């Protein structure tokens, strides 16, 4: 698709450049706006897929520059990890129809970044600080991400962290009321298996606690701590059982941990104590992370 010119819903012209990578739903390319030097990425997927529709709806809900600026000022922070959203659109190529979304271009995902960092703790603390504020903001809109994993957390050139890929979000607040806990077998193990929360394994709507639990598993990965359930490969049921056992052992203090990693397990213990509808104490979680 390289070289194809596109026009977004705002009438701005873009051109698809080099392929960056492909996933289960589509491909990501570099791109540049024709009217300025703005660099961006363009995600392209078949019109038959619906994940991009979900993502655009999320950005329409949460991406408002003025609202974000007010929220950052209220929280006394200078960064919120939501990528800049430039627009979206659709196009036809040969006999196929496609959707696209235009987003801020970031540098690297945290899975790759942490592979080459010799002393990861300071970076993990910064990533967690950014992500806890980002999730708090998203959760205030009644939305859970549902696919928190190192590949979906990226950094820019200043090592500020961003949460990407809002294709399988859930709305846990509907008409002002929190959804009830309800299991659906068609949604078992939703998300990325190794990082899915227990709620995601059970097929229920992921809520605030599920996102925060998945973020805890990311911390284990970033710190170089093996995920105990990885030995079960893609067996979703066995991974689920292993996570349940792991969390029970964490709560009973039966996990062998180095003192330097105690803060990670304290965080996991805290978020897995939350009830399904409970609003987390994000400030407390930030304090736990600061103790790493």
Curated annotation (Swiss-Prot):
Its EC number is 2.7.11.1. The active site is at 147 (proton acceptor). GO terms for molecular function: ATP binding; protein serine kinase activity; protein serine/threonine kinase activity. It comes from the Viruses. InterPro entries: CK1_Ser-Thr_kinase (IPR050235), Kinase-like_dom_sf (IPR011009), Prot_kinase_dom (IPR000719), Protein_kinase_ATP_BS (IPR017441), Ser/Thr_kinase_AS (IPR008271). Pfam families: Pkinase. ATP binds at residues 20-28, 43. Keywords: ATP-binding, Kinase, Nucleotide-binding, Serine/threonine-protein kinase, Transferase. SMART domains: S_TKc (SM00220). SUPFAM superfamilies: Protein kinase-like (PK-like). It is an enzyme of class 2 (transferase). Residues 14-292 form the Protein kinase domain. It catalyses: L-seryl-[protein] + ATP = O-phospho-L-seryl-[protein] + ADP + H(+); L-threonyl-[protein] + ATP = O-phospho-L-threonyl-[protein] + ADP + H(+). Belongs to the protein kinase superfamily. Ser/Thr protein kinase family. Poxviruses subfamily. This is Probable serine/threonine-protein kinase FPV226. It comes from Fowlpox virus (strain NVSL).
């Amino acid at each position: 698709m390289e070289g194809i010119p596109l026009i977004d819903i705002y009438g701005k012209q873009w051109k698809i450049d080099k392929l960056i990578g492909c996933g289960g739903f589509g491909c990501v390319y570099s791109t540049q706006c024709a009217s300025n030097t703005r660099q961006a990425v363009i995600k392209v997927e078949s019109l038959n897929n619906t994940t991009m529709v979900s993502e655009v709806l999320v950005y329409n809900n949460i991406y408002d520059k003025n609202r974000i600026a007010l929220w950052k000022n209220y929280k006394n922070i200078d960064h919120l990890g939501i990528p800049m959203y430039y627009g979206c659109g659709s196009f036809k190529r040969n006999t196929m129809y496609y959707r696209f979304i235009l987003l801020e271009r970031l540098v690297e995902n945290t899975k790759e970044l942490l592979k080459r960092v010799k002393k990861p703790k300071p970076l993990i603390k910064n990533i967690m600080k950014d992500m806890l504020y980002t999730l708090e903001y998203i959760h205030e809109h009644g939305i859970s991400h549902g696919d928190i994993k190192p590949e979906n957390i990226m950094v820019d050139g200043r090592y500020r962290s961003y949460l990407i890929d809002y294709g399988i979000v859930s709305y846990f607040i509907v008409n002002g009321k929190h959804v009830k806990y309800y299991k659906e077998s068609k949604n078992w193990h939703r998300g990325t298996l190794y990082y899915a929360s227990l709620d995601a394994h059970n097929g229920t709507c992921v809520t605030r606690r599920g996102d925060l639990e998945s973020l805890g598993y990311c911390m284990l990965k970033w710190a170089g701590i093996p995920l105990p359930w990885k030995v079960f490969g893609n067996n979703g049921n066995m991974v689920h059982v292993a996570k349940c056992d792991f969390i029970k052992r964490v709560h009973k203090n039966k996990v062998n941990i180095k003192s330097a990693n105690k803060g990670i397990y304290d965080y996991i213990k805290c978020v897995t104590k939350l009830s399904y509808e409970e609003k987390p104490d994000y400030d407390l979680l930030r304090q736990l992370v600061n103790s790493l």
